[in-house]
């Protein structure tokens, strides 16, 4: 186990039977609230983002991590929002959930991502839906997505296969 994996494991809270019976929820809140833990995760994510000139953080904890990584890299950060949170006009990408669908959005005015080299940052890679939708959203706007980086990957849910051929760096896998 790597040093960063040990930090994450020691500060991650496991909540049984949430949000439903049989699910073992992995809560990263204690990690993000710990100054040393947050710095360690920020440094590790930033180390995977070499060459990026923009960081895209996915709603909601990806905002926190993405902003921290962008500061470390000296780049800007783009908040990829859940649908309906931004004023029009927006660029949007809809993706499927287990029951229904969801939408991610970025502003269509005042922001040109064409030609930018972007790294996607999020807290968890589970089914891969949000990372894959973010990838499509950014590339449709002309950006080059270098890769994605997450704190935690839930391997049993197959997200890595869903986002292929996009490469993903995971700091901790379960």
Swiss-Prot record:
GO terms for molecular function: adenine binding; adenine phosphoribosyltransferase activity; AMP binding. Pfam families: Pribosyltran (PF00156). It comes from the Bacteria. The keyword Cytoplasm applies. The keyword Glycosyltransferase applies. Its EC number is 2.4.2.7. GO terms for biological process: adenine salvage; AMP salvage; purine ribonucleoside salvage. GO terms for cellular component: cytoplasm. Pathway: Purine metabolism; AMP biosynthesis via salvage pathway; AMP from adenine: step 1/1. It is found in: Cytoplasm. Keywords: Cytoplasm, Glycosyltransferase, Purine salvage, Transferase. InterPro entries: Ade_phspho_trans, PRibTrfase_dom, PRTase-like, UPRTase/APRTase. It catalyses: AMP + diphosphate = 5-phospho-alpha-D-ribose 1-diphosphate + adenine. Belongs to the purine/pyrimidine phosphoribosyltransferase family. Catalyzes a salvage reaction resulting in the formation of AMP, that is energically less costly than de novo synthesis. Homodimer. This is Adenine phosphoribosyltransferase.
């Amino acid at each position: 186990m790597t040093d960063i994996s040990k930090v994450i494991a020691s500060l991650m809270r496991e909540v049984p039977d949430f949000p439903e019976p049989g699910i073992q929820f992995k809560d990263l809140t204690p990690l993000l609230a710990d100054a040393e833990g947050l710095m360690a995760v920020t440094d590790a994510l930033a180390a995977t983002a070499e060459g990026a000139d923009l960081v895209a953080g996915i709603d909601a904890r990806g905002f926190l991590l993405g902003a921290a990584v962008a500061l470390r890299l000296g780049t800007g950060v783009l908040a990829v929002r859940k649908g309906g949170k931004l004023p029009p006009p927006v660029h949007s990408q809809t993706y499927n959930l287990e029951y229904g669908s969801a939408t991610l959005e970025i502003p269509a005015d005042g922001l040109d991502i064409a030609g930018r080299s972007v790294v996607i940052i999020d807290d968890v890679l589970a089914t891969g839906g949000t990372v894959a939708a973010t990838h499509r959203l950014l590339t449709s706007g002309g950006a080059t997505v270098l890769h994605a980086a997450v704190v935690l990957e839930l391997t049993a849910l197959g997200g890595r296969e869903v986002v292929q051929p996009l490469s993903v760096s995971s700091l901790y896998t379960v």
